Amino acid sequence: MADTLVKNFQNSPLGAGGKLDLLAIGVHPDDVELGCSGTIINEIKNGKKAGVLDLTQGELGSRGSVETRYEEAAKAAMIMGVSVRENLKMRDGFFQNDEEHQRKLIVAIRKYQPEVVITNALSDRHPDHGRAAKLTTDSCFLSGLRKVETKDEKGDQQEPWRPKYIFHYIQDRYHEPDFIIDISDVFEQRMEAIKAYTTQFYNPENEDDGPQTYISTSAFLDSIVARARVIGKKIGVQYGEGFNTEKSLGIKNLDSLVTIET
């Protein structure tokens, strides 16, 4: 069954399609898991429908292969419980924020019609991350313009769609979060989704997957846990995920705030 899922994922979206409440976008497979998988799992447990869109296949990665990345991404998708995962197969390292790539992303945005999009950090150690963030924000805006015409896989004209919110998860370079989501109850599941990428992150059983990299050490996984603790502490919880937004957020009343014991 796993082989069938991977083959389906390589050629078409994994899982069922349809409108999503939340679409998480990452330029590389594993970006979403590292940045916002706890929030995805939380939202799904609260009855929301979520999906993942990978922009590239991560083919320039030093460890693993395209095939193993698909297998790992499919496993992580099942752990998170997302309804769909699709890969747009843009060129890792060389994609651009231009009309060609914007139109490709607009087709996906209009296909899934998400209310909320969560995507890469606005700037980061890896230049792909910031470029993907700008590509996503520009494409989300253009997707709402009626005169930007696109067609779906069947050749039918797509309707314009603009997500209500775009949020950016925090990656390697620390950004002070604009808001924080409590992921304490799902933290172990989040780490399980991250560790599904056995060729990318520390795994003593997978020592033959290529040279040691910045993210393949045990220290990197330790830093992921530490980051979640530090962010969670800011709102008085055990673990948190932080996000940045370019649009002001509002709440209906003060009861919506997380209580911090002092």
What does each model-identified segment do?
Residues M1-Y112, N244, S256-E261:
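Active-site rim/loop-helix segments in enzyme catalytic domains that contact anionic ligands
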Residues A2-L23, E99-T262:
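Metal-dependent de-N-acetylase/amidase catalytic core
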